[in-house]
Amino acid sequence: MDPIGINKVLDHLAPSELIKPVKSCHNKPSVLVLDDRIVDAATKDLYVNGFQEEIQYQNPTPENLQHMFHQGIEILDSARMINVTHLALWKPSSFKLGNPVDFALDDNYDTFWQSDGGQPHQLDIMFSKRMDICVMAIFFSMIADESYAPSLVKVYAGHSPSDARFYKMLEVRNVNGWVALRFLDNREDDQLLKCQFIRLLFPVNHENGKDTHLRGIRLYVPSNEPHQDTHEWAQTLPETNNVFQDAILR
């Protein structure tokens, strides 16, 4: 059959006027650069604690960082989302004795998961059913964790380890606070990460460190209430939301 005849048959089976164009998701950025020193309107929704001016990193204290940790949790929990972190099974590739993965989930700034082995380190997150994840929040601190702080984080998602696909790589250049990763480029209709399994891979640390620290991570699904965009989070912060400022003034 000639090409014209083939096209007629195909048009009869699926009329071209009924076929809607589909936007490809392959053009979505595969790397997300994180640096809360750089004030950028395009990334403001990422930083739950807000942007930090570079001068405010000179004299931070553990109390300042601890305040940011708990402040971020309060802001996240007020954002009309449901925290499903503890509905998952969390399985690390390794952990140092005394620093289990539970310490990344206990809402305590002073405790953390620490890997114990060769890179890349890995953290698998498994739910009993498919979840509609709208936000993955991770606490990073270059100051507190130094060479234990990850500089790259690869995110994979799927229904199981066997079909998990790469979603995005986070390049953590300089962050001290909570980062809220939303999935705006994943599904055009609902902007959710629909999955039962998530894998986080930590291939590289800052300062060529070997083991990784993770002080806090949370997963959220939408609630039945109207969704609150993350740009509203900044409105819940105190007028001087840069908590390092107090340390400098002292």
Swiss-Prot record:
User: What InterPro entries is this protein classified in?
Assistant: APC10/Doc1, APC_su10/DOC_dom, Galactose-bd-like_sf
**Annotated pathway:** Protein modification; protein ubiquitination
Q: A Gene Ontology CC term for this entry?
A: mitochondrion
Q: Which GO terms describe its molecular function?
A: enzyme regulator activity
Pfam families noted in UniProt: ANAPC10
Record domain DOC: where: 60-246
Q: Mind listing the UniProt keywords for this protein, alphabetically?
A: Cell cycle, Cell division, Cytoplasm, Mitosis, Nucleus, Ubl conjugation pathway
PROSITE patterns in alphabetical order: DOC
List locations, semicolon-separated.
Answer: Cytoplasm; Nucleus
**Signal peptide as annotated in the record:** none
The cross-references to CDD domains, in alphabetical order and at most eight, read: APC10 (cd08366)
- Name the GO terms of the biological process aspect: anaphase-promoting complex-dependent catabolic process; cell division; chromatin organization; protein K11-linked ubiquitination; protein ubiquitination; regulation of meiotic cell cycle; regulation of mitotic cell cycle
Q: What is its quaternary makeup?
A: The APC/C is composed of at least 13 subunits that stay tightly associated throughout the cell cycle: APC1, APC2, APC4, APC5, APC9, APC11, CDC16, CDC23, CDC26, CDC27, DOC1, MND2 and SWM1.
Q: Extract the PANTHER family matched here.
A: ANAPHASE-PROMOTING COMPLEX 10, ANAPHASE-PROMOTING COMPLEX SUBUNIT 10
| Function per UniProt | Component of the anaphase promoting complex/cyclosome (APC/C), a cell cycle-regulated E3 ubiquitin-protein ligase complex that controls progression through mitosis and the G1 phase of the cell cycle. The APC/C is thought to confer substrate specificity and, in the presence of ubiquitin-conjugating E2 enzymes, it catalyzes the formation of protein-ubiquitin conjugates that are subsequently degraded by the 26S proteasome.
Any other comment in the entry?
Answer: Present with 1364 molecules/cell in log phase SD medium.
What's the protein name?
Anaphase-promoting complex subunit DOC1
Q: Please give the organism.
A: Saccharomyces cerevisiae (strain ATCC 204508 / S288c) (Baker's yeast)
